[in-house]
From Swiss-Prot:
Source organism of this protein record: Methanothermobacter marburgensis (strain ATCC BAA-927 / DSM 2133 / JCM 14651 / NBRC 100331 / OCM 82 / Marburg) (Methanobacterium thermoautotrophicum)
SUPFAM superfamilies reported for this sequence: P-loop containing nucleoside triphosphate hydrolases
Positions with a binding annotation for ATP: G9, K10, G11, G12, I13, G14, K15, S16
The protein's name: Nitrogenase iron protein 1
Taxon lineage: Archaea, Methanobacteriati, Methanobacteriota, Methanomada group, Methanobacteria
Cofactor: [4Fe-4S] cluster
CDD domains: NifH (cd02040)
Length: 275
């Protein structure tokens, strides 16, 4: 049965890069059939899988061809490791609601049975924080059963992770969605691992993996590839391989217990994130 995973995190945290490298590792190292559904108007959730290509989005296709012509063969492309890719896209700048585009795109994919076809994993790569009902849809309506949050030892990344947990709690009991853990995408700040470990303990989850910072990630991006495609034998590829394995084998799913603002302030002061 296909496992549906939503990846959340603060804008700029490296969420899409982490998600694409994890998906590539699942396919390349673990032989899994994977699909990525990008839920960001920037439509950059799949470009490393597609060799740098910015694929035509579902919303663009809807505007140009109409709903009847917006079929899977028009909007799904296959990239590295046989990973299937689709991008929701969004409205024209300054017009309409991008969150609504996510709702429309997911509904259309479900109508065509796309998420059920011979897949092991579907990743929903969701814009930034839980900012509105549209972007909360994978949580709210049970489209995803598992949530992973990408964070770091930086203050705003932790605040965003805590806010995402607050959004999860609101919908978890009705939708059945659960938190699978925090992925630390390291920024090499002092005490980062210890801070994230305590944060995870305080909210009742696990740090499923600590991804070290490595310049090969940027080098691979410059070459329009995931790290796994660029150099599958390098140390960073092995980190993503391990992260993928941990997600595949994960059985530790919880409804988190978000921290209060005062508790968050105390935590970041304790580790010197605030002076």
């Amino acid at each position: 049965m296909v496992r549906k995973i939503a990846i959340y995190g603060k804008g700029g945290i490296g969420k899409s890069t982490t998600q694409q490298n994890t998906a590539a590792a699942m396919s390349y190292f673990h032989g899994k059939n994977v699909m990525i559904h990008g839920c960001d108007p920037k439509a950059d959730s799949t470009r490393l899988i597609l060799g740098g290509k910015m694929q035509t989005t579902m919303m663009d296709t809807l505007r140009e061809l109409g709903e009847g012509a917006c079929t899977p063969d028009k909007v799904i492309e296959t990239g590295f490791g046989g990973i299937r890719c689709v991008e929701s896209g969004g409205p024209e700048p300054g017009v309409g609601c991008a969150g609504r585009g996510v709702i429309t795109a997911i509904t259309l994919m479900e109508r065509h049975g796309v998420y059920e076809n011979d897949l092991d994993f579907v990743f929903f790569d969701v814009l930034g924080d839980v900012v509105c009902g549209g972007f909360a849809m994978p949580v709210r309506d049970g489209k995803a059963e598992e949530i992973y949050i990408v964070a770091s030892g930086e203050m705003m990344a932790l605040y965003a992770a805590n806010n995402i947990c607050r959004g999860m709690v609101k919908y978890a009991r009705q939708s059945g969605v659960r938190l699978g853990g925090i992925i630390c995408n390291s920024r090499n700040v002092d005490g980062e691992r210890e801070l994230l470990e305590e944060f995870c303990e305080r909210i009742g989850t696990q740090m499923i993996h600590f991804v070290p910072r490595d310049n090969i990630v940027q080098k691979a991006e410059f070459n329009k590839k995931s790290v796994i495609e660029f150099d599958p034998e390098c140390n960073q590829s092995q980190e993503y391989r391990e992260l993928a394995r941990k997600i595949i084998e994960n059985t530790d799913f919880v409804i988190p217990e978000p921290m209060t603002m005062d508790e968050m302030e105390d935590l970041v002061v304790k580790y010197g994130v605030l002076d």
